[in-house]
Amino acid sequence: MQQSKEERVHDVFEKISDKYDVMNSVISFQRHKAWRKETMRIMDVKPGSKALDVCCGTADWTIALANAVGPNGEVKGLDFSENMLAVGKEKVKALGLEQVELMHGNAMELPFEDHTFDYVTIGFGLRNVPDYMHVLKEMTRVVKPGGKVICLETSQPTMIGFRQIYILYFKYIMPLFGKIFAKSYKEYSWLQESASTFPGMKELARMFEDAGLERIQVKPFTFGVAAMHLGVKPESE
């Protein structure tokens, strides 16, 4: 029986959890840290805020949010991979971040009331969900009016020449890195597949609008290999 996308993605992340952080740095040449740092600067997270990190994985962005909201804030991290969460929980415990709660859950059915969070983020996770629009609408539902929904994700470079290099890298070299560094050629082949079919920047910006967000900001990184999309929930619906 053929696996659904959700089942396949779950299997991938359960298998690569112990090498995920190392591989993130290898395949992005450490750039993912700078992308997240700049995204956080644009977000301008206020101390004492409530934030939700969807598809939080090993909790790197969750931890950055916790540092930004401070001890009087609150951060939830949600992921459907227990193994990824286990890695994240060890990090959170080591840092003593009592304002963080990591939980097992599904991005398609966020277990929160409407208008709960000031910020809702998803980092390198939207491309792996079964329905992009459904998850964006769920994120919009649980953010407060005036709150921000933010996606940091791989994208499709538009610069001629560089786009071809990017495609070759993702299709052939990244899975090879997965085999060398994580013994996971098949799993990293899936990650390049999910990245190659993900909407480009303009299309994702339209999806943010269709999800009910306004004042959309788009910030490309490293010639467009990744991009931040930020939208604000209207004050009155």
From Swiss-Prot:
It comes from the Bacteria. GO terms for molecular function: demethylmenaquinone methyltransferase activity. Pathway: Quinol/quinone metabolism; menaquinone biosynthesis; menaquinol from 1,4-dihydroxy-2-naphthoate: step 2/2. Its EC number is 2.1.1.163. The keyword Phosphoprotein does not apply. It catalyses: a 2-demethylmenaquinol + S-adenosyl-L-methionine = a menaquinol + S-adenosyl-L-homocysteine + H(+). InterPro entries: MenG_heptapren, SAM-dependent_MTases_sf, UbiE/COQ5_MeTrFase, UbiE/COQ5_MeTrFase_CS. S-adenosyl-L-methionine binds at T58, D79, N106, A107. Belongs to the class I-like SAM-binding methyltransferase superfamily. MenG/UbiE family. PANTHER family: 2-METHOXY-6-POLYPRENYL-1,4-BENZOQUINOL METHYLASE, MITOCHONDRIAL, METHYLTRANSFERASE. Methyltransferase required for the conversion of demethylmenaquinol (DMKH2) to menaquinol (MKH2). This is Demethylmenaquinone methyltransferase. The gene is menG.
